[in-house]
A protein has these predicted regions:
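Conserved small/polar residues in nucleotide/adenosyl-binding loops
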Residues: 214-223
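Short beta-strands and strand-loop turn motifs
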Residues: 2, 25-29, 82-86, 204-206
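Conserved N-proximal alpha/beta basic substrate-recognition cap immediately N-terminal to
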Residues: 2-57
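Phosphate-binding site of ATP-dependent enzymes
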Residues: 95-176, 197-203
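Conserved metal-phosphate-binding beta-hairpin within the catalytic cores
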Residues: 118, 127, 182-213
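Active-site nucleotide/adenylate-binding loops and adjacent lid/helix of ATP-dependent enzymes
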Residues: 35-123, 175
Length: 226
């Protein structure tokens, strides 16, 4: 049972090693894990297949000197994040030019490819899928700031509401998008898609596998935790 998180646990390397050694494991295969972990690739696939996702610019280190020019169309505020890290490590919401360049330096210190994404001001949701069954959406409400590393893992920093208080149309659109993400990325068994929702619609931020099953998600799947 693969419950590992972080680079080797999520980016497909461990799954590829298991495949070579003919070791059975749970969750998605090597290719699906790689695509889900690499947000620059997954965002390109989202666009190609009509999955709504925030507008973004992918930067390499050679682009740093003209990053402001390349990202001008996104405006401020915007989101700066490493392309292939999880748990919101290295993610910044920037509101000024000075913050933009500081956030770029921080993200590039962690990885060679960085995503600059249009900031969506709205509500945040996580939607799990097990097999063909989409689970009820969970609304993520940090008490302070955004859903960063601290708010994800420090008890009491975030409120999670399940099922989320949303209209049936929004719930169905997120469920439909989650199924499509699952199929397009070639994920298996279980996964999670993260969304922002504003007055203009839904936006898929990324897919996650293996997922972080909170007690709420476990309750919805009727899992027994020991």
């Amino acid at each position: 049972f693969n419950a590992l998180h972080g680079d080797e646990g999520e980016n497909g390397k461990l799954q590829a090693a298991f495949d070579l050694l003919n070791i059975c494991y749970t969750g998605s295969g090597a290719q699906g894990c790689m695509l889900a972990m690499n947000k620059s690739l997954s965002k390109q696939l989202f666009r190609t297949h009509g999955i709504p996702t925030p507008e973004a610019v992918i930067l390499s280190e050679s682009d740093k000197c003209r990053a402001a020019e390349l990202c001008e169309k996104l405006g401020l505020p915007c989101v700066v994040k490493p392309a292939s890290l999880g748990s919101s490590v290295g993610v910044s919401i920037v509101r000024t030019n000075d913050e933009f360049f500081t956030a770029l330096d921080s993200a590039f210190s962690l990885e060679h490819t960085v995503i600059v994404e249009k900031y969506i001001k709205g509500r945040e949701f996580a939607v799990g899928i097990v097999g063909s069954r989409v689970l009820p959406a969970i609304e993520i409400i940090p008490k302070h700031g955004f859903y960063d590393y601290k708010n994800k893992y420090q008890p009491g920093c975030t409120v999670e509401i399940c099922p989320a208080d949303i209209d049936s149309d929004t719930a169905e659109r997120m469920a439909k998008a989650t199924r499509k993400v699952f199929r397009v990325l070639g994920l298996g068994a279980y996964a999670r898609a993260d969304f922002m929702v504003d007055e203009n619609g839904i936006y898929c931020l990324e897919a996650n596998t293996p997922v972080s099953y909170t007690h709420l998600r476990a309750h919805e799947t009727k899992a027994n935790l020991v």
